[in-house]
Amino acid sequence: MKVNGMNVEGIVRIANAEVYGLKQSIIASAYPMATSYCEDMDQYVVEEKDFKRVRHLGKATPGSGHDCFLKGIQVQFDLQAPEYIWRQLDRYHFIDYISSQSKMHMILKFDIDEMCNKYVTEDAIVNLKKYIDYYNNVDWYSGRFKKDYEEDCVRRRRKIDPNWEFKLKLRNGEEMEFTKENLFKMIIANCPCGFMLTARMTTNYLQLKSIINQRSNHKMQEWHYITDWMKGLPLVDEIVMKNWED
């Protein structure tokens, strides 16, 4: 079933969200104590006794094993979030990437202003765009820097070194050649943590149970918005939360 996403401009966005297997997993939650199985889940009418059972099982202590039916309730959605949220999300084993935007492939073509969240400083954006411009026009800048050097030598009445080449200077004092390879290293290394990337994710209610439990009071506000959205998914408030959240 399709469910609503959410959008907090410049912070986090969820779209194209769907939930699968809700009814089927509710039915299957009875199997451990059943003497038969449901031959046609489409025809089965979920009753109050089924909801009572899953409310009890779903709110079991995390890790007890009694809430395993939650694994059958699948959730897929597009998530746009900054780099620091993605790195924290990666610690969860049962939320996975279907496909995602690639910084390695597209950093030179992204609209950097649009891709950075509102907390990234103007200085950081200007610096990143500078190195991207260098990369995209490396030959022109090599000639420009060479000309500037020669003109400076003439102005200062210094001998021009015919082998002089512009170097990239690192903060540790090291110098690197002004090449596309080295410029790309600088671009990737100086991409801010507030860089927003979108990925299609797949997970399940059991994993969401852990995320909600661990991230609802996180110091990063993005997690508050994400977990609030998770809490609003169908039946999450009835079969995932309550007892263990108190």
Regions found by a protein language model. Give the residues of each.
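Family-specific signature for flavin-dependent thymidylate synthase
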Residues: 1-246
